[in-house]
Amino acid sequence: MEFSVEGTQFSPPVKRIFDTAGTHDFQKSLTMYRLQSHLERYLKLVQGQKIPKSSQNRAVVRFVCILERLDALMDETPPRTGSARRFGDLACRDWHDRMQGELDGLLETLLPEAARRSAAELRYYLGSAFGSRERLDYGTGHELAFLAVVVALDMLGLWTEDKFTGEDMLYVWARYYALVHRLILTYNLEPAGSHGVWGLDDHLHLAYILGASQWAQDRNVPMQPSDILDPKAVARYSETNLYCNSIAFLLRVKTGHFAQHSPMLHDIAQTVPTWSKVTTGLIKMYRVEVLNKFPVVQHFWFGTGFFPWVDMAHGMSLPNYEAPSETSEKPAAGTAHTTTTTMPPPRMTANCGYGPLGRLVTPRR
């Protein structure tokens, strides 16, 4: 489905997912189609590529300058001394306030004049990509918001002002994860919606998919999934591969044996023989545990431009639910976590240039 800036109305995103019914509708939305089809293309783009040290793409350089400014804000907003908390230094709220105050100006440096109307939506997704100001946490929902930013800028044609390569894509994500890692460490951010040791990672998921995809079709792959259990091998490739980069961060912040604090990643290393199978399994898991989980997607809001609340098949608005009243009966604890069915791959239109994601297999836990 083609996207035209001139023919698109943009508006500040609003909340549409209030319960599991909204989560179900999300699976058949145009937004879901756009997120998944673009992600599919990005995974193909990064195959056989390494994270570079820099980029020659002018839009990528401008965007990374935004991330660098947000990184500099941490230097200007140090953690508060004498405010001992198990999770979440309160200075993080000051950082969020300063970040929100600068977003409009930063986006103006990024967007061409013709696309600046889209800033009404872009500022929401970019502002949501660095954790929660209220809860002082970071998780896969915030990582999803950053995917939305990358997709939205792609839809604007920003990345393709110059030649855009898989290395450029990896550079954008690597700089984002470097900023996120520093936020987590500086402000001691809590994992958002963590499954504890039975989750893939306290904070991330897409990083592992992108990193596994880098090596999925490489006949001369420098290491196999089982080699992840070797910390020296992980360190060797942590600057060029996002999977190793994420494992290296885990090893930095976790204590104890890898099999104890990250049993799912340990199990993947022991039982999944190829990076191609790791990639397909992690995509399957992402659909179930992120895109189809109410606690995660309830924080993904919808505008009228990039990610509308519209049915993919018919182009009609999806049901608009309202927030439950204070007096309404609340669902029993755990109700929102029981949905585990996945959405089938979206049907691709003939002229969109994207193929289906295909049937995928979850790695054995």
UniProtKB/Swiss-Prot annotation:
<comment type="function">
    <text>PPIases accelerate the folding of proteins. It catalyzes the cis-trans isomerization of proline imidic peptide bonds in oligopeptides. Acts as a regulatory subunit for PP2A-like phosphatases modulating their activity or substrate specificity, probably by inducing a conformational change in the catalytic subunit, a direct target of the PPIase. Can reactivate inactive phosphatase PP2A-phosphatase methylesterase complexes (PP2Ai) in presence of ATP and Mg(2+) by dissociating the inactive form from the complex.</text>
</comment>
<keyword id="KW-0963">Cytoplasm</keyword>
<dbReference type="GO" id="GO:0005737">
    <property type="term" value="C:cytoplasm"/>
</dbReference>
<dbReference type="InterPro" id="IPR037218">
    <property type="entry name" value="PTPA_sf"/>
</dbReference>
<feature type="compositionally biased region" description="Low complexity">
    <location>
        <begin position="331"/>
        <end position="342"/>
    </location>
</feature>
<dbReference type="GO" id="GO:0003755">
    <property type="term" value="F:peptidyl-prolyl cis-trans isomerase activity"/>
</dbReference>
<dbReference type="GO" id="GO:0000159">
    <property type="term" value="C:protein phosphatase type 2A complex"/>
</dbReference>
<dbReference type="InterPro" id="IPR043170">
    <property type="entry name" value="PTPA_C_lid"/>
</dbReference>
<dbReference type="GO" id="GO:0008160">
    <property type="term" value="F:protein tyrosine phosphatase activator activity"/>
</dbReference>
<dbReference type="GO" id="GO:0005634">
    <property type="term" value="C:nucleus"/>
</dbReference>
<comment type="similarity">
    <text>Belongs to the PTPA-type PPIase family.</text>
</comment>
<dbReference type="InterPro" id="IPR004327">
    <property type="entry name" value="Phstyr_phstse_ac"/>
</dbReference>
<protein>
    <recommendedName>
        <fullName>Serine/threonine-protein phosphatase 2A activator 1</fullName>
        <ecNumber>5.2.1.8</ecNumber>
    </recommendedName>
</protein>
<dbReference type="Pfam" id="PF03095">
    <property type="entry name" value="PTPA"/>
</dbReference>
<keyword id="KW-0539">Nucleus</keyword>
<dbReference type="GO" id="GO:0000082">
    <property type="term" value="P:G1/S transition of mitotic cell cycle"/>
</dbReference>
<keyword id="KW-0697">Rotamase</keyword>
<dbReference type="GO" id="GO:0000785">
    <property type="term" value="C:chromatin"/>
</dbReference>
<dbReference type="GO" id="GO:0007052">
    <property type="term" value="P:mitotic spindle organization"/>
</dbReference>
<keyword id="KW-0413">Isomerase</keyword>
<dbReference type="GO" id="GO:0006357">
    <property type="term" value="P:regulation of transcription by RNA polymerase II"/>
</dbReference>
<feature type="region of interest" description="Disordered">
    <location>
        <begin position="321"/>
        <end position="349"/>
    </location>
</feature>
<dbReference type="GO" id="GO:0006914">
    <property type="term" value="P:autophagy"/>
</dbReference>
<dbReference type="GO" id="GO:0006281">
    <property type="term" value="P:DNA repair"/>
</dbReference>
